[in-house]
Amino acid sequence: MDILETKAKPKKQREASFWQSLKKALRDNFPDWSATRLESRASLGVPDVLIMDSRGAWHMVELKTTANMSVNITPHQVAFLTKHARGSVWIAVKLTSATGHEVFLYRGDRAVDVKLEGLRARPDKHFSNPVNYRAVLQA
């Protein structure tokens, strides 16, 4: 192994895969919706995805992936989601296990609960294996 070689970060790869699944579901089921993946390194805490639905309403979604009950949400993300909780801001967590995938949806005002309790916090919506991403997007 070269000392300058950087290892791929599996968490980001899983999050990118989650984004690809949502993007495909949008394209296949809601062609009149628009979604943009945001690069939030410049603005800490800003959610990962900005979506405009067919009515012109805006939604922001923080994407998270995990292989256990914990959710790695930063204090900046908690602050943003809590501050903007009156709007349509969401945390979408994809749990990957040996038996498949599940998606947990939490409204932004639940960010503190998700930070402290992880997936033990009661979700606003829960989708079991196999995940129907059309239903996730309609939630």
Protein language model features and the residues they cover:
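Acidic-basic catalytic patches of nuclease active cores, encompassing PD-(D/E)XK
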Residues: 1-40, 54, 139
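Short strand-connecting beta-turns/loops that link adjacent beta-strands
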Residues: 54-56, 97-98
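Conserved catalytic cores of phosphodiester-cleaving nucleases, focusing on short active-site segments
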Residues: 49-51, 57-67
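Nucleic-acid nuclease catalytic cores
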Residues: 84-111
